[in-house]
Curated annotation (Swiss-Prot):
Pathway(s) served: tRNA modification; tRNA-queuosine biosynthesis
Domain of life: Bacteria
Enzyme Commission no: 1.7.1.13
Descriptive protein name: NADPH-dependent 7-cyano-7-deazaguanine reductase
A single BP term in Gene Ontology: tRNA modification
Active site residues of this protein: C48, D55
GO molecular function, one term: preQ1 synthase activity
PANTHER family: NADPH-DEPENDENT 7-CYANO-7-DEAZAGUANINE REDUCTASE (PTHR34354:SF1)
Role description: Catalyzes the NADPH-dependent reduction of 7-cyano-7-deazaguanine (preQ0) to 7-aminomethyl-7-deazaguanine (preQ1).
Ranges annotated as spanning the membrane: none
Coiled coil segments of this chain: none
Taxon lineage: Bacteria, Bacillati, Bacillota, Clostridia, Thermoanaerobacterales
Organism: Caldanaerobacter subterraneus subsp. tengcongensis (strain DSM 15242 / JCM 11007 / NBRC 100824 / MB4)
InterPro entries to which the protein is assigned, alphabetical: GTP-CH-I_C/QueF, NADPH_dep_7-cyano-7-deazaG_red, QueF, QueF_type1
Keywords of the record: Cytoplasm, NADP, Oxidoreductase, Queuosine biosynthesis
Amino acid sequence: MTDKYKERRFDIYGYEKIDKEVLESIEYEYPEKNTIVEYITDEFSSVCPWTGLPDNAKLTIRYIPHKKLVELKSLKYYLTSYRNVGILQEHAINRILDDLVEFLQPKFMEIIGEFQERGGIATRIIARYEKEEY
C-alpha cells in the first residue's frame, strides 16, 4: 500500500487570521445583577496545525456581563475567522477566552469546547476566568 497521503496538506493559516477586531459590543443595562448569559453553537471549526484536517466543535460561551454584551453577528464573524487557522483545540479555547475577556471584561466567563472524535477520542475543553473584584 502506498502512502499517497503523506505529502497531502490543506491550506493552513496562522493566528494572524483570527479577527478579534470584528467584535462589537452592546451596553449592558444591568451591571449590578449576576445574570448568566450563554451562547451555544455547533458550527465552530479550526484545523489541525499539522495535517490541515478540520476540528469541529460545539462551543458554549457562558458569562456574567459587567458593562458590555457581545453583539452576536460580530461573535459569529469572530468565531468563523478560526475556520482555516492551524491551532490546537486546547489553544483555540483558551485564545477565545482571552480575546473575549479582554474585549468584554466580564465578571465571569467560561468557554466549553466539545470537539468531535478523532481516533475514537472526543475532546472536551473547559477554560474559565473569574474577575477578582467587581
